[in-house]
C-alpha cells in the first residue's frame, strides 16, 4: 500500500444517521475502516473494516467518544454541530449527512445559527425542525464523501512524505 492510499478512519455518529449504508459501501470500496458509534446497540454489516461501538446511554456519550478518538487522518460524519466543532478543532474532516462540510472557517457561524434557532424554538417563535432528508442530499453526501476521502489521503501522503 502506498502512502497515497494509506488507510484513514471514518467515524459515524450513527444515532439517526440516514446515510450509514452509503458510508459502508464507500468505505469498503476504498478499503477504509469505519467506526460506527451509537448510544446503544446498532446493527452493522459483518465486515472486518466495520466496527461498532456502543458508547453508553449518557446524554452525549457517543459524541464524547467520537471527539476523544478522532484526529487529523479521520473523517467524521455527524449532523451534531457541537460535535462537528470539537472534531474540526481536533483536525478531522467533518461532513454532515446532507453533504455539507464543516470547516474551521464555517464553524463559528454554524454554531451561532444553531444556538439562535435553539433559542427561537424554545421561545416558541419557530416551530418544527430541519427540513426532510432528500435524495439530492444523499447524492450530495456521496460526492462530498468521495472528495473528502481523496483530500485526506493526499494530505496524509504529503505529511508522511515530509516526515521521510
Swiss-Prot record:
Pfam families linked: DUF188
Domain of life: Bacteria
Cysteine pairings via disulfide bonds: none
Entries under InterPro entries matching the protein: UPF0178
Family that this chain belongs to: Belongs to the UPF0178 family.
Matches recorded under HAMAP family: UPF0178
Protein name: UPF0178 protein BRADO3147
Amino acid at each position: 500500500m502506498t502512502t497515497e492510499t494509506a488507510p484513514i478512519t471514518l467515524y459515524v455518529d450513527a444515532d439517526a444517521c440516514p446515510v450509514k449504508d452509503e458510508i459502508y459501501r464507500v468505505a469498503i470500496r476504498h478499503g477504509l475502516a469505519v467506526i460506527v458509534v451509537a448510544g446503544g446497540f446498532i446493527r452493522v454489516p459483518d465486515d472486518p473494516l466495520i466496527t461498532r461501538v456502543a458508547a453508553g446511554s449518557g446524554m452525549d456519550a457517543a459524541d464524547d467518544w467520537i471527539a476523544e478518538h478522532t484526529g487529523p487522518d479521520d473523517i467524521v460524519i455527524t449532523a451534531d454541530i457541537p460535535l462537528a466543532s470539537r472534531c474540526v478543532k481536533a483536525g478531522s474532516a467533518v461532513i454532515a449527512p446532507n453533504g455539507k462540510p464543516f470547516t474551521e472557517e464555517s464553524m463559528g457561524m454554524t454554531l451561532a445559527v444553531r444556538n439562535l434557532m435553539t433559542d427561537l424554538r424554545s421561545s416558541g417563535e419557530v416551530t418544527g425542525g430541519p427540513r426532510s432528508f432528500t435524495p439530492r442530499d444523499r447524492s450530495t453526501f456521496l460526492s462530498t464523501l468521495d472528495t473528502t476521502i481523496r483530500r485526506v489521503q493526499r494530505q496524509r501522503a504529503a505529511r508522511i512524505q515530509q516526515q521521510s
